[in-house]
């Protein structure tokens, strides 16, 4: 990542100020996130190899797996200058996404979804149980949809859309809110518009489930036992 940033800094045709329009973390604490802060807003790096998630090509397991992460701390970019932020008068980079140069739209959109705060919706533990959303979401295996994998990714899940609206603002997602107890055993009918068509019907239908009941093993002896707070 730092090598890529050095290449960017050395290119006179690139004005990094164009990519610093947001104060995503409100670094100066003034409540305004719509202002430059010295950090590159959305750093997307394309590496020149097949991604490990697609087999890795000649590099195999030594290839880079597409991911979103950060540099541990803001990294001032040598050879740059910025009047904003507190990075020694330089532009800085912090979080990033990286994907292969031959990445299809699905991988790029999936990683950018992480950049917007969305988590993976696939079974990251590979437990064998899989995930219910599967190809219905680009944050799951929907990022690989299409005759040529990843060229026709599916959309974001209802949960992801709700998250994006809540975190980024807007009033474009509307739908019914239903309690589980109100569902009719014989079925309920709700009209949904297609995801690519904004009509008068619901965009989503949310069914509120009760809190998950997690049975615990009884104490070995007595009435109480210690719990580690995890698991």
Where are these regions (language model features)?
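Surface-exposed, low-complexity/disordered Ser/Thr/Gly/Pro/Asn-rich loops and linkers
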Residues: 1-15, 19, 185-191
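Extended amphipathic secondary-structure runs
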Residues: 4-14, 35-43, 48-53
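Acidic, glycine-anchored loop motifs typical of Ca2+
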Residues: 18-41
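Extracellular hydrolytic enzyme modules, especially secreted metalloproteases
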Residues: 42-44, 48-231
């Amino acid at each position: 990542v730092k090598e890529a940033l050095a290449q960017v800094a050395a290119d006179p045709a690139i004005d990094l100020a164009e990519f610093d329009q947001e104060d995503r973390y409100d670094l100066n604490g003034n409540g305004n996130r719509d202002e430059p802060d010295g950090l590159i807003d959305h750093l997307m790096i394309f590496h020149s190899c097949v991604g490990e998630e697609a087999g890795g090509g000649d590099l195999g397991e030594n290839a880079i797996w597409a991911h979103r992460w950060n540099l541990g701390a803001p990294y001032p970019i040598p050879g740059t200058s910025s009047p904003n932020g507190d990075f020694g008068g330089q532009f800085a980079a912090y979080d990033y996404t990286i994907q292969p140069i031959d990445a299809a739209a699905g991988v790029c959109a999936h990683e950018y979804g992480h950049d917007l705060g969305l988590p993976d919706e696939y079974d990251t533990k590979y437990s064998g149980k899989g995930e219910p959303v599967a190809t219905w979401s680009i944050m799951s295996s929907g990022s690989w949809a299409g005759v040529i994998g990843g060229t026709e990714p599916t959309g974001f899940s209802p949960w992801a859309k709700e998250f994006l609206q809540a975190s980024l603002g807007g009033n474009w997602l509307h739908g019914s809110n239903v309690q589980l107890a109100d569902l009719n055993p014989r079925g309920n009918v709700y009209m949904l518009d297609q995801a690519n068509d904004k009509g008068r019907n619901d965009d989503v239908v949310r069914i509120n489930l009760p809190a998950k009941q997690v049975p615990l093993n009884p104490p070995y002896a007595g009435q109480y036992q210690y719990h580690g707070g995890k698991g």
